[in-house]
């Protein structure tokens, strides 16, 4: 399998699942792959605006601090392999082809057993997690694709940090048609045992579900003051 064949095979997978929103397909896929999602520490990022920027900055900080840091983002800008990075370097074409073959073989095994195969984003996320585990990353910075609660990335155990960027109206046909409903889905990445960092100027309507998720999981929300945030050059 070549890089182009791998990309075409991934794009040929369904975009939406037959059985609706669930983490069961993703968990089944990772179980077949040896559960790579349990082999690295994670910073999980959800929200509407600024996810990609925050993910890139967090990855850069950890890399410059001397940690081997994976990064998976969605979507990419110019090159499909932008979605898979370690210490700022994209996955090689050969590795993409090899890991795509492994993930698709696992998907075929699930289907042969009578299960439902993964959608494209689930397969892509599995490739990222498998690579991070094989490369023994210290950390992985993981950006959600859509929402949070049922996003394929949310199969990870409790992250070290769950970061919520600014919540806005997006994907209303899937996440809900109010800020509160959308925030509730994004806040689904908050798990017991993690730290939660919240955007300083979060809309009031979004705060209720975020505070509720923190209370349910016994986590503390850290909300920096906007005046305390500055870029170091």
List the predicted regions and their residue ranges:
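ATP-dependent carboxylate-amine ligase catalytic core
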Residues: 23, 27-38, 64-157, 173-175
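Glycine-/small-residue-rich active-site loops that bind phosphorylated ligands and cofactors
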Residues: 50, 91, 147, 170, ...
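Alpha-helical scaffold segments in soluble metabolic enzymes
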Residues: 28, 57-60, 95-98, 102, ...
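Buried hydrophobic positions in well-ordered alpha/beta secondary-structure cores of metabolic enzymes
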Residues: 45-48, 52, 69, 125, ...
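N-terminal-biased segments
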Residues: 1-20, 88, 142-146, 162-174
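Acidic, Mg2+-coordinating active-site environments of NTP-dependent enzymes
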Residues: 110-112, 135-144, 159-233
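N-terminal leader/targeting and accessory segments in enzymes
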Residues: 1-49, 53-68, 77-79, 136, ...
């Amino acid at each position: 399998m070549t890089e182009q064949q791998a990309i075409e095979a991934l794009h040929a997978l369904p975009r939406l699942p037959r059985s609706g929103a669930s983490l069961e397909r993703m968990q089944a896929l990772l179980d077949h792959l040896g559960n790579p999602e349990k082999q690295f520490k994670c910073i999980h990022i959800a929200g509407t605006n600024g996810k990609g920027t925050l993910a890139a900055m967090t990855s850069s900080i950890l890399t410059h601090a001397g940690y081997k840091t994976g990064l998976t983002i969605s979507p990419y800008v110019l090159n499909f392999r932008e979605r898979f990075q370690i210490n700022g370097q994209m996955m090689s074409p050969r590795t993409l082809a090899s890991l795509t073959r492994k993930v698709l073989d696992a998907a075929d095994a699930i289907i042969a057993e009578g299960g439902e195969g993964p959608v494209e984003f689930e397969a892509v996320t599995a490739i990222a997690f498998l690579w991070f585990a094989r490369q023994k990353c210290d950390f992985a910075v993981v950006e959600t694709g859509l929402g949070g609660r049922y996003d394929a990335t949310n199969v990870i155990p409790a992250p070290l940090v769950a970061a919520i960027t600014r919540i806005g109206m997006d994907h209303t046909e899937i996440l809900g048609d109010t800020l509160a409903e959308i925030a509730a889905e994004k806040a689904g990445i908050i798990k017991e045992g993690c730290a939660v960092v919240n955007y300083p100027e979060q809309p009031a309507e979004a705060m209720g579900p975020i505070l509720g998720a923190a209370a349910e999981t016994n986590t503390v929300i850290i909300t920096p003051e906007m005046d305390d945030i500055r870029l170091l050059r």
